[in-house]
């Protein structure tokens, strides 16, 4: 149904939505030849795409996988060679056969990805258990030391570029449901970030500029799909200053009350060795203490509500997620809660990443302690591993 509505909609440009690999290859080759900047949707199985691109010598510079393999046997992953309808029928009539087909498909999937990587593709896993389930299927996905051949994107991208510095998905919802309130909050957030960017350290200046560009373009890209809400990557200082500016605007009657929040996929909110904490290499990535501590700490420091849940995005038993919501109403109490809770909510995770000896986190938590003398975090003692190995 989604496919049919896409093809029939005004949003769809027909040559950008295809369901045949030959047409896809032709369209991609033409786009490369004409140096087009274009997104093309393919309706079908991704394994067929990988194989067609390989056979036709189409270079994939960057590849990933976000298949819902945290639910592999009930529709989270559809095996190659089956239509959507055929696979659904197999799930119902012969689940054992469906499982074996998924396993075979995963092996084939990994095999073709490996071939592309040998040609120069940079491949990373999103964290939705592709690597984990591929290893269970005994696909060629492990190095000799037993680790995965490919990183999660938190290991190579999100962790060292964002989470280690406290940057993550800060959110707010306009309780008034008014577009004009959302517009005002966009302007406030942009002004706050532009001011903070003037004194931002060199290792976070680019993140600040990227997020300023994001918030400036948010409205024109029509990102709202329901509640008048916004998401914006910001660090601890950015979140606090933006929230305080919102609170001031509420007090002055410019906007209605705001609900603050964030994604669980953040600096401190989630423990998952396959995604959020995959760039923690001190052995503690398999523990779930950070998410629990965050929820408890947020509850003490002014959150309106907190939540703790299991399985989000990675799979039941593979991740613990924590979240919060904070209503701010322009009061002095709201300002106190903002400074206390948002500071904790971010810096708790930076402390954890600092203990794991992540360079960015060490720098960031050191700056946080300078800014707030009440914050006391033990810094790691960096020593040469050979000192231990030679004992």
Which residue ranges define each predicted feature?
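Short, surface-exposed connector motifs at secondary-structure boundaries
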Residues: 32-36, 227-229
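Extended catalytic-interface subdomain
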Residues: 40-58
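Short amphipathic alpha-helix with an adjacent loop that forms part of the alpha/beta core around
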Residues: 26-30, 52-55
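Short, flexible, glycine/charge-rich loop motifs used to bind or transfer phosphoryl groups or to couple energy/partner
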Residues: 1-2, 53, 296
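Short acidic-hydrophobic, aromatic-tinged amphipathic segments that line or gate anion-handling sites
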Residues: 14-25, 41-43
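Extended charged low-complexity segments that act as oligomerization/scaffolding linkers
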Residues: 21, 28-34
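Single conserved hydrophobic/aromatic residue that forms the stacking wall/gate
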Residues: 1-8, 12-13
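Ligand/cofactor-recognition surfaces for anionic moieties
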Residues: 42-46, 62-322, 326-391
């Amino acid at each position: 149904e989604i496919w049919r509505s896409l093809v029939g909609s005004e949003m769809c440009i027909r040559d950008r939505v295809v369901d045949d690999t030959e047409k896809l290859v032709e369209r991609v080759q033409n786009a490369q030849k004409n140096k087009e900047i274009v997104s093309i949707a393919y309706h079908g199985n991704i394994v067929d795409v990988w194989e067609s691109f390989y056979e036709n010598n189409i270079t994939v510079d960057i590849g990933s996988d976000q298949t819902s393999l945290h639910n592999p046997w009930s529709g989270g992953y559809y095996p190659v060679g089956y239509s959507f309808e055929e696979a659904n029928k197999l799930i119902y009539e012969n689940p054992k056969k469906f499982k074996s087909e998924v396993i075979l498909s995963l092996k084939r999937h990994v095999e073709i990805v490996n071939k592309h990587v040998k040609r120069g593709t940079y491949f990373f896993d999103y964290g939705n258990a592709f690597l984990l389930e591929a290893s269970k299927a005994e696909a060629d996905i492990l190095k000799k030391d037993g680790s995965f051949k490919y990183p999660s994107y938190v290991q190579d991208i999100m962790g060292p570029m964002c989470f280690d510095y406290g940057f993550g998905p800060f959110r707010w919802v306009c309780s008034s449901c008014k577009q004009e309130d959302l517009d005002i909050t966009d302007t406030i957030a942009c002004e706050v970030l532009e001011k903070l960017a003037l004194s931002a350290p060199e290792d976070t200046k680019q993140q600040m500029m990227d997020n300023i560009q994001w918030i400036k373009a948010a409205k024109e890209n029509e990102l709202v799909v329901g509640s008048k809400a916004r998401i914006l990557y910001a660090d601890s200082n950015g979140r606090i200053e933006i929230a305080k500016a919102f609170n001031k605007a509420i007090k002055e009657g410019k906007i209605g009350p705001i609900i603050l929040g964030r994604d669980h996929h953040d600096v401190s909110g989630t423990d998952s060795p396959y995604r959020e904490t995959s760039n923690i290499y001190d052995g503690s990535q398999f523990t779930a203490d950070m998410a629990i501590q965050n929820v408890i700490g947020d509850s003490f420091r002014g959150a309106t509500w907190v939540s703790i849940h299991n399985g989000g995005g990675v799979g039941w038993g593979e991740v613990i997620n924590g979240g919060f919501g904070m209503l701010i109403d322009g009061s002095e109490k709201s300002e106190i809660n903002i400074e206390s809770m948002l500071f904790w909510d971010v810096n708790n995770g930076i402390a954890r990443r600092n203990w794991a000896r992540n360079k960015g986190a060490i720098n960031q938590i050191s700056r946080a302690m300078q800014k707030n003398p009440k914050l006391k975090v033990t810094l790691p003692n960096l020593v040469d591993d050979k000192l231990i190995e030679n004992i």
